[in-house]
Amino acid sequence: MKTFTATPETVTRDWFVVDAEGKTLGRIATEIAIRLRGKHKPEYTPHVDTGDYIIVINAEKVTVTGNKAAGKIYYSHSGFPGGIKQISFEKLQAQKPEMIIEKAVKGMLPKGPLGRAMFRKLKVYAGVEHNHAAQQPQVLDI
């Protein structure tokens, strides 16, 4: 008997909505990354994108433990000398709360074209409203 290999034509992708209110950042990000990769499915194939679409709402209400709210620093660099920028978790949560979950999940996905395709299936919203009602997403409890 041959080993089953999923192909892009045979993969079925579902839509799930995750409420991040009061959830810990790392715990929710790992579950989202697993779902985006498709590792929860029996037909998982490492070189094929078998994951589902994930909609995250209430990203502004995600929490971190300990003193990380004030001490966690996100860095970015422009590429020019002296072009490093830094922003704390608290400031980033006030300015762009979607970016916190996006950065956490993106670091858990593969690097390369397949990882970028998986990341495009993640939709993050700061509030309760999202514009994917037509896809009839199922609620995913994490």
UniProtKB/Swiss-Prot annotation:
Pfam families: Ribosomal_L13 (PF00572). One of its GO terms (cellular component) is cytosolic large ribosomal subunit. Keywords: Ribonucleoprotein, Ribosomal protein. GO terms for biological process: negative regulation of translation; translation. PROSITE patterns: RIBOSOMAL_L13. GO terms for molecular function: mRNA binding; structural constituent of ribosome. InterPro entries: Ribosomal_uL13 (IPR005822), Ribosomal_uL13_bac-type (IPR005823), Ribosomal_uL13_CS (IPR023563), Ribosomal_uL13_sf (IPR036899). Transmembrane segments: none annotated. It comes from the Bacteria. PANTHER family: LARGE RIBOSOMAL SUBUNIT PROTEIN UL13M, RIBOSOMAL PROTEIN L13. This protein is one of the early assembly proteins of the 50S ribosomal subunit, although it is not seen to bind rRNA by itself. It is important during the early stages of 50S assembly. Belongs to the universal ribosomal protein uL13 family. Part of the 50S ribosomal subunit. This is Large ribosomal subunit protein uL13. It comes from Shewanella denitrificans (strain OS217 / ATCC BAA-1090 / DSM 15013).
